[in-house]
């Protein structure tokens, strides 16, 4: 029944502490995942290396975004999921268990967030250290908003953020522009602030987002 933003912040801090603890105990030994290059398609200029020359996690992320769009907007499960976020009272009246539906979906979302962290340590960086995510999870919240709570929109927004960060890093590596390293780390968050300022008030979130629904012991 507590405020969901506060609960999420507590869980986030707990997760940070747990990863630091297990890392200090020597329990973490990430393995490098091999790249899966798709012949012919990977040779397409510009888009080939982006979409067809990646590791398993990248392909899984692209597939998951498409799958979630189908599930959310083309299935009964998706209709129920959206209803408990928009009008939980009406969903409850129609016989949908609001608490259970929300719990299952939040659990699935947490699992996907965990896979995103695994991508950073296993596929992208091939190592693990404290603070590896550098707050990228909060950028993901901005991506979700910028994508209008739509998996395809969020994927497009993620491409935009990744492209901007990648271009800045490449310019620095090639010494085309003398960009201080701290600014490179700041860039995703500067973009987040700018984009949120632009889209704020133009994109409507789910009506009951973050609002706990009264628990019914009879359910």
Locations of regions flagged by a protein language model:
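Hydrophobic core segments of alpha-helical transmembrane domains in multi-pass membrane transport
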Residues: 16-20, 58-71, 109-117, 140-143, ...
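Helix-loop-helix "hairpin" substructures at the membrane interface of multi-pass membrane proteins
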Residues: 50-128, 151-152, 156
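Cytosolic-side transmembrane-helix boundaries in multi-pass membrane proteins
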Residues: 86, 92-93, 97-100, 171-219
């Amino acid at each position: 029944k507590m405020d969901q933003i506060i609960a999420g912040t507590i869980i986030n801090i707990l997760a940070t502490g747990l990863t630091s603890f297990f890392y200090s105990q020597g329990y973490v030994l990430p393995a490098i995942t091999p790249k899966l290059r798709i012949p012919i398609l990977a040779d397409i200029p510009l888009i080939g290396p982006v979409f067809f020359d990646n590791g398993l996690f990248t392909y899984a992320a692209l597939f998951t975004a498409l799958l979630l769009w189908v599930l959310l907007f083309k299935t009964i499960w998706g209709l129920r999921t959206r209803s408990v976020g928009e009008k939980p009272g009406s969903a409850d009246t129609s016989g949908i268990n609001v608490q259970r539906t929300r719990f299952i979906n939040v659990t699935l979302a947490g699992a996907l967030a965990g896979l995103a962290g695994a991508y950073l340590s296993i596929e992208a960086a091939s190592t693990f250290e404290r603070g590896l995510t550098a707050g990228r999870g909060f950028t993901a919240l901005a991506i979700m908003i910028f994508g209008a709570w739509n998996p395809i929109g969020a994927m497009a927004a993620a491409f935009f953020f990744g492209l901007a960060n990648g271009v800045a890093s490449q310019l620095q590596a090639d010494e085309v522009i003398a960009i201080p390293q701290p600014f490179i780390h700041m860039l995703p968050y500067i973009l987040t602030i700018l984009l949120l300022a632009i889209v704020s008030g133009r994109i409507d979130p789910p009506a009951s987002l973050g609002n706990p629904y009264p628990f019914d012991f009879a359910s």
